[in-house]
Amino acid sequence: MAVNGISRYIRLWNHVANPAEYILRKGERHHRDLHFTTKPLPVHFRVSAALYQVFKELFMADVYEIDALVNTLPADPVVIDIGANAGFFDIQLLSKVDRATIYAYEPMPANVETLRHTLQQNPRLQQSVRLFEMAVTGQPLDWLDLFAEAEENDQVVASRFAGFNENNTQTITVPCVTLTDIIWTHDLRSVDLLKMDCEGSEYDIIYHTAPELLRRISRMVIEVHDMDKGRNNIGAFDAYVRSLGYTTTHAPINSFCHALEAVRR
C-alpha cells in the first residue's frame, strides 16, 4: 500500500544513497535531470521532469512495497515486467537482489531510450534485464495504436484507450506480443513475479491468457484501473484472479486505480 506524508521521505532514505538530490534540488528538475544512486546495491539512474511523478510513486510512495516484496522472492527470481516504463521497478528490484532474470516490455520510445541508457551505465543490470520495445496484449495483434501526450519527451505513459487521459491526444503505433507468446518463447515453466502497469490493458492480458499458463506465475502485482461497470473493474478482476487459484489483496492508489497483489495458493 502506498505511503504518504513524512513516511515518503523515510522510504526515499531507505531506497537511495543520495536523498539530498531530491530534497534540495527537486526544484531544478525542469532545467536538468535529477541523478540518483540506489542502495544497498548501487544502480545509477536519471530522472527527467516527465518521469518525476513515476519516480515518486516507486521510491517515495513505494507503491510496490519493494522490501516486503523482495522477501517473498527467491534469490534469483524470474520476472516479467509489463509496462516497464523507464525501468524504475527493475532498478528498485535490482538494488535489493544481486541477480534476477527480468523480461521487460515497454512500447514508448522515450521510456525505452531512458532504460537503455540506464542499462549502459550499469553493466550488472545488462546481465539481468532483457528489454523488448513492444506492447503486451492478451489477444494476438501485430500492431497496436496507443494514445499518448503530444510532446515526445512527455510520452512516458500511454494507453490503448482514447479516453484514458485527456492529455493523450497523439496516436502512435507499436508492435505487440501476447503474454502467451512471452511464456512459450522464453520457455518459462515457472515465473516468480509478474508486474503489470499497462494503463487498462491488464484486462485483455489476464482475461485472454489461458488459466494453465497464468498458473505458472507464483505472484502478481498489478495496477488495476476501473474502466467500466462490467468486467473491467477491480471487483470483477479480483474475483477472476481468485477463481484461478490465487489469494488476493488490493488497495486504492487513487480514485480509479488499485494496487492488486495475487499469490498462488
Predicted regions and their residues:
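Phosphate/nucleotide-binding beta-alpha loop and adjacent structural elements of enzyme active sites
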Residues: 1-265
